């Protein structure tokens, strides 16, 4: 496997049974993207993350096997990408602790999943941390370690995960600053605005929470029964039917060529009967899924083969990336061979990565302005003009105490980035 310019890391949830919506929206496009020659792709089974919710050991093991078999059956090539199990790279959890020691608790308090749990408890009149594990609270640090252990440049995520990438950047910047070198690349979130979603059996988005899914590898007859159970209206054969909003048409379109979709749309206009339409949808889906199903059944019958693939991927990755980086980081923080005579001189402040900084200045209009830049010079906040430097300074003082997004909403102050990024900068200034 050759080293490439851009490292792209994708985490794979190891819980639940994959359904057609997962395949169309995530698995198929990710595998297609892995074939690109301009990226070094990392795919990992997030089995450690699953322990936050899953406490059935047998189910955890089975789910990991099923998800691994699914991705391999769908075409992921472990000879062309890095495919591994999170728990097979112990350097990840060691890095998590190193990051924990520089991570601000304030930024973790603002993590969406933790805040949502606290808000539910408050609404129910419970202690705000009732039922909240340290695993849930520390989830963003483990996710940061997943990314930073391989210095990934890009992480494809949904919009609900952007905050975690911003946190990973913050932890990386803090570590770089504290230990005086740029050990970590700052990762970027990659948002696919064209993510495909499929309707479920009831017409709503296909989702486990709605109980309306079609399992990806359902046996052929089960697949047929499920497709024929999809809700349709009462229009009879011979009556024109709308493709707009039709779950059947959307399912067909997700598996068909543009020419096939056009022909199916014409059949709708010509009044195809719902039974015939469902038969065509079933046949078109099964045409693509049947060979994948066969491969999946072969793989799931050979768990030792899957285990060997995952272990080999983890071992190669450790040797190539994780072990050398951890050795460097251990030395950086002082976890060293006690017999070593290596120099231990402190890094000069001038060599350290710069902190965020407020800059005040006067413009030609006679007004006093300020802005907040991060350590790399990127603009985070910009003010309007103030009558005096004292007025501007008072606002800066209030901003430095900001602990939540509402604290940033001051007259004459304009955030140029997400509030979480600005709040992380304030945390860094307070802890410096």
Curated annotation (Swiss-Prot):
Record's keyword annotation contains Nucleotide-binding: yes
Record-listed E.C. numbers: 6.1.1.2
InterPro entries referenced in this protein's UniProt entry, alphabetically: aa-tRNA-synth_Ic (IPR002305), Rossmann-like_a/b/a_fold (IPR014729), Trp-tRNA-ligase (IPR002306), Trp-tRNA-ligase_bac-type (IPR024109), Trp-tRNA_synthetase (IPR050203), YegP-like_sf (IPR036913)
Annotated TM spans: none
One Gene Ontology molecular-function label: ATP binding
GO CC list: cytosol
Source species, domain of life: Bacteria
Class of this enzyme: ligase
CDD domains: TrpRS_core
Motif ('KMSKS' region): 205-209
Positions bound to ATP: 13-15, 21-22, 158-160, 198, 205-209
Localization per Swiss-Prot or TrEMBL: Cytoplasm
Keyword vocabulary terms for this entry: Aminoacyl-tRNA synthetase, ATP-binding, Cytoplasm, Ligase, Nucleotide-binding, Protein biosynthesis
Example of a GO biological process term: tryptophanyl-tRNA aminoacylation
Binding-site positions, L-tryptophan: 146
Reactions that this protein is recorded to catalyse: tRNA(Trp) + L-tryptophan + ATP = L-tryptophyl-tRNA(Trp) + AMP + diphosphate + H(+)
Positions occupied by motif 'HIGH' region: 14-22
Oligomer status and interactors: Homodimer.
Similarity annotation: Belongs to the class-I aminoacyl-tRNA synthetase family.
Function of the molecule: Catalyzes the attachment of tryptophan to tRNA(Trp).
HAMAP family: Trp_tRNA_synth_B (MF_00140_B)
Protein's UniProt name: Tryptophan--tRNA ligase
């Amino acid at each position: 496997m050759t080293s490439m310019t851009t490292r792209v890391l994708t985490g794979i949830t190891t819980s639940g049974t994959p359904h057609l919506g997962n395949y169309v929206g995530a698995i198929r496009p990710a595998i297609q993207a892995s074939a690109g020659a301009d990226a070094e792709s990392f795919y990992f089974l997030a089995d450690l993350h699953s322990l936050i919710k899953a406490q059935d050991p047998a189910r955890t093991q089975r789910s990991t096997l099923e998800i691994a078999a699914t991705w391999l059956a769908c075409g992921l090539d472990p000879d062309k990408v890095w495919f591994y199990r999170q728990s097979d790279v112990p350097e990840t959890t060691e890095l998590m602790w190193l990051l924990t020691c520089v991570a601000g608790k304030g930024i973790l308090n603002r993590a969406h999943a933790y805040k949502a749990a606290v808000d539910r408890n408050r609404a129910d009149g419970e202690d705000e941390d009732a039922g909240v594990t340290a695993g849930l609270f520390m989830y963003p640090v483990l996710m940061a370690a997943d990314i930073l252990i391989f210095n990934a440049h890009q992480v494809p995520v949904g919009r609900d995960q952007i905050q975690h990438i911003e946190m990973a950047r913050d932890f990386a910047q803090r570590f770089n600053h504290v230990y005086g070198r740029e050990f970590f690349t700052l990762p970027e979130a990659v948002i696919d605005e064209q993510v495909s979603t499929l309707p479920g059996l009831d017409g709503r988005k296909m989702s486990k929470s709605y109980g309306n899914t079609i399992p990806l590898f359902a046996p052929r007859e089960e697949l047929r029964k499920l497709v024929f159970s999809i809700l349709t209206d009462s229009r009879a054969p011979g009556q024109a039917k709308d493709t707009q909003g039709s779950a059947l048409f959307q399912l067909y379109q997700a598996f068909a060529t543009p020419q096939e979709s056009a022909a199916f749309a014409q059949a709708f206009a010509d009044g195809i009967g719902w039974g015939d339409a469902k038969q065509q949808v079933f046949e078109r889906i099964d045409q693509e899924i049947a060979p994948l199903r066969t491969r999946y059944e072969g793989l799931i019958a050979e768990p030792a083969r899957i285990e060997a693939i995952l272990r080999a991927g983890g071992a190669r990755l450790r040797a190539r990336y994780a072990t050398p980086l951890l050795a460097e980081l251990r030395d950086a923080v002082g976890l060293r061979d006690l017999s070593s005579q290596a120099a231990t001189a402190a890094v000069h402040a001038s060599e350290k990565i710069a902190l965020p900084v407020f800059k005040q200045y006067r413009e030609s209009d006679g007004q006093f302005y300020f802005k907040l830049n991060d350590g790399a010079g990127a603009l985070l906040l910009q003010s309007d003009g103030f009558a005096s430097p004292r007025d501007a300074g008072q606002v800066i003082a209030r901003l430095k105490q900001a602990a939540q997004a509402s604290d940033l909403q001051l007259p004459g102050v304009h955030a140029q980035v997400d509030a979480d990024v600005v709040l992380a900068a304030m945390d860094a200034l307070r802890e410096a």
